[in-house]
From Swiss-Prot:
It is found in: Cytoplasm, Cytoskeleton, Microtubule organizing center, Spindle pole body. This is Tubulin gamma chain. GO terms for molecular function: GTP binding; microtubule nucleator activity; structural constituent of cytoskeleton. It comes from the Eukaryota. InterPro entries: Gamma_tubulin, Tub_FtsZ_C, Tubulin, Tubulin/FtsZ-like_C, Tubulin/FtsZ_2-layer-sand-dom, Tubulin/FtsZ_GTPase_sf, Tubulin_C, Tubulin_CS. Keywords: Cytoplasm, Cytoskeleton, GTP-binding, Microtubule, Nucleotide-binding.
Amino acid sequence: MGGEIITLQAGQCGNHVGKFLWSQLAKEHAIGTDGLSQLPDSSTERDDDTKPFFRENSRNKFTPRAIMMDSEPSVIADVENTFRGFFDPRNTWVASDGASAGNSWANGYDIGTRNQDDILNKIDKEIDSTDNFEGFQLLHSVAGGTGSGLGSNLLEALCDRYPKKILTTYSVFPARSSEVVVQSYNTILALRRLIEDSDATVVFDNASLLNISGKVFRNPNIDLQHTNQLISTIISSVTNSIRFPSYMYSSMSSIYSTLIPSPELHFLSPSFTPFTSDYIHDDIAHKGHSSYDVMLDLLDPSNSLVSTAMNNPTYFNVYNTIIGNVEPRQISRAMTKLQQRIKFPSWSSSAMHVNIGRRSPYLPLQPNENEVSGMMLSNMSTVVNVFENACNTFDKVFAKGAFLNNYNVGDLFQSMQNVQDEFAESREVVQSLMEDYVAAEQDSYLDDVLVDDENMVGELEEDLDADGDHKLV
């Protein structure tokens, strides 16, 4: 069984997404927005596991295991007003000095540095309420100031403080074209921390989110209220097997171990279809889908929540959750068909991992009782396109030296030389990641990795003296 998971919501994006996520989780577990159980009898035996995401007291009052953080109060205030008495007020952090990140990663990072003890103290106290703490999930954007900067500072601190706990992120990347020029700076700086400190990163981008929202919702005026429902749907589906456990995939570690073949290749692309009234409001009516149809449709680029060039991608690992009226024979038939369509490198297990998820028994009955929905997480080569887009925009702006003065803030950037060095080093880290993904497409990938490891061991051995001690250089 999985342990407890603490959700960290950083910045406006993270807290907006969190608002929809907790609404969804509460609905699936028959919990009201005030935290009270909606089951008719408190003695009713539950068919779910609330413990990974909720604390429960003796009066059947549920409280999310969540920490809300922002540099300004408006979004968190909106969340608290919507869910009165639901969140623990001790788990809310807003910058007390009125500082704003102002779309600058450096400002957000500096705010995190100056307030790190206070934030970590809240996290430590929340961990104290757990019995079998498994890890964190961070909700944030990499493009703004707080989500990227404060989020980066938090990733570094948690990786150092809790090195054996799983650190997952749900990270929203900007569209290729953006009104805020410095978003490319923020993205590269945050991406470095995702590469170095996250164990698994589920990637979204605004272009794909807006495109899918236009097809899913009846409302022609698409905004963040719609895209955030899509993100919360993915998080709900990823954690379905943890909250409605079976004998497989009942923990974060069991899910991500199927997807991540090596530590650096931990960026995952989500897909989902169809978005039904179980997850979103004001959805467009659609015909019923069989398990077979859903599994094949998940491979369609139009159902991916991250924009990537899908021409003949190489898949390293695939994990599906199929929820609803699932027919095992159709799952087997679909897997046979998909094995013929998906290109795996020879070093990969070439296995498609499928979780038969459980639809919450507390949700209203669907108009179509045979409805099936599916979520797919893919570790595949084309995610590198997201990083290439970020790098291309970054390179153009950085070459001109534009807006660098905005980042000469705090202890990390004490001089303009510090700014230049940090930007250059972060760009190199991202470049190395892209090269790793390209190399992983080759059948010789694992052989090359082993050779590199042996060479590194050889270099270390050469630095030892006759007694086996490290030489002083």
